Each structure stands twice: as structure tokens, then as C-alpha cells.
Design a protein with these regions (language model features):
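Extracellular cell-wall/glycan-interacting regions and their flexible linkers
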Residues: 1-41, 145-186
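Peptidoglycan-targeting cell-wall enzymes and recognition modules
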Residues: 3-25, 32, 51-127
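Broad hydrophobic/π-residue packing in well-ordered secondary structure
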Residues: 27, 73, 138-140
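Short amphipathic alpha-helical interaction patches enriched in hydrophobic/aromatic residues
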Residues: 30, 83-85, 139, 143
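Hydrophobic/aromatic-lined pockets within catalytic cores
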Residues: 31, 35, 48-52, 105, ...
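Short, functionally critical alpha-helical segments immediately adjacent to catalytic or ligand/cofactor-binding
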Residues: 38-54, 100, 134-136
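Residue-level signal for the start and early helices of compact helical domains
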Residues: 44, 63-66, 150
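A charged, amphipathic interaction segment
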Residues: 96-165
Length: 186
């Protein structure tokens, strides 16, 4: 499955099917890391407001400025992501997920506006509404978080419903290889 991305600082006009394509990639990645669907949906609801789920999204109105935000979660400044990923960073969309994993594993980018660690967030079975709020306040942390909490929660709950009807694509070792390894071990 390939990412759908539009390099723009405007609304990329992503269709529902295009957003679902990117959601499938994101969900498979973080399910493989052990995240709950509640946490994944909360992150997706926030990402949809930040970037329309477009991994090549630049911050609106800043004319592709590196001092503005970029990517799924709008890393600000964009150098947070470019310095981490190095050459080819603008099209390394899987690398954005690796960056989030790195931040999660090292408790980076995470503030303490709400008393929950990034580790606890990822495995939480709290409500999607609560986790959307936690991700907004502890990760995104905009100046006026009240302006978009309702739409972020609506998005997150929609993605939670979607994820409940979407099986996880296989990642890692193919099942046939596991049987081959087991058979050789006899």
C-alpha cells in the first residue's frame, strides 16, 4: 500500500478514500507497535485537523516555510522532522511514523498538560474522546486548544468506527515463513 500525498500549503482536498488509504498505513504501523485502536483513533482525529491526513502538508499561509509546520502532525518547525530524517525527508512518509514512534519511545514532544505519559496513552483503553483530548493537549499543544477539540473528537470517533471494521494488514514476517521455520525446526 502506497501513501497518497500532495505537497501543498493549502487544503489538499483529500477524498475520503484517500484519507482511508493513509489511515490504513498509519493504523497498521501503530497496531504492530501495540497501540490500542482508541489511541490510534485519537491520534488520527488530531492528524486530520493538523494535516488532512496528508503527509506532505505544509502549514497554511507560511509559503512552505521551514519555520512552520510540516507533515502528518505538523512538526514545528519543520526542521524537527528534516533533521531527524535527513536527505529525502519531504517524501519519507514512513519516516514520519518512525519519528512518532521515536518520540513515543523516548517521551519526546509530549508535555504534561494532562497527567498521562506517552507510553500510557498508546496502550490506553480510555474513551476516544478522552484520548483525543490527551493527544491534543500533551502532543499537539496549540495555543487555543478549545477552538478545535469538538471537531478533533468527531474525527477520532469516526476513525475509531472505521478501524473497528478494518482488519490489520499483515506486517513483519509472512505467515507462510513462520510455518517454514517451524517445520525446519523438527
Amino acid at each position: 500500500m502506497s501513501w497518497i500525498a500532495r505537497d501543498t500549503d493549502l487544503n489538499p482536498n483529500m477524498t475520503q478514500a484517500e484519507q482511508e488509504n493513509n489511515v490504513n498505513i498509519i493504523a497498521a504501523y501503530f497496531r504492530n507497535e501495540g497501540w490500542t485502536d482508541n489511541a490510534i483513533a485519537a491520534m488520527l482525529g488530531n492528524m486530520q485537523v493538523e494535516s488532512y491526513l496528508n503527509p506532505a502538508q505544509w502549514q497554511h499561509g507560511l509559503n512552505y516555510s521551514m519555520s512552520g509546520g510540516f507533515g502528518l502532525v505538523q512538526w514545528t518547525p519543520a526542521t524537527k522532522l528534516s533533521d531527524y530524517l535527513g536527505a529525502g525527508w519531504r517524501t519519507d512518509y514512513d519516516g514520519q511514523l518512525d519519528r512518532i514512534r521515536y518520540e513515543w519511545q523516548n517521551e519526546l514532544q509530549w508535555t504534561w498538560n494532562v497527567a498521562m505519559t506517552f507510553h500510557d496513552f498508546a496502550v490506553s483503553t480510555d474513551t476516544v474522546d478522552q484520548l483525543t483530548y490527551v493527544f491534543l493537549r500533551n502532543y499537539e499543544n496549540p495555543e487555543d486548544w478549545t477552538a478545535s477539540i469538538t471537531v478533533r473528537r468527531t474525527n477520532a470517533n469516526n476513525w475509531y468506527t472505521y478501524l473497528g471494521n478494518t482488519p490489520t494488514p499483515a506486517l513483519g514476517i509472512p505467515i507462510w515463513l513462520l510455518f517454514k521455520i517451524r517445520w525446519r525446526g523438527r
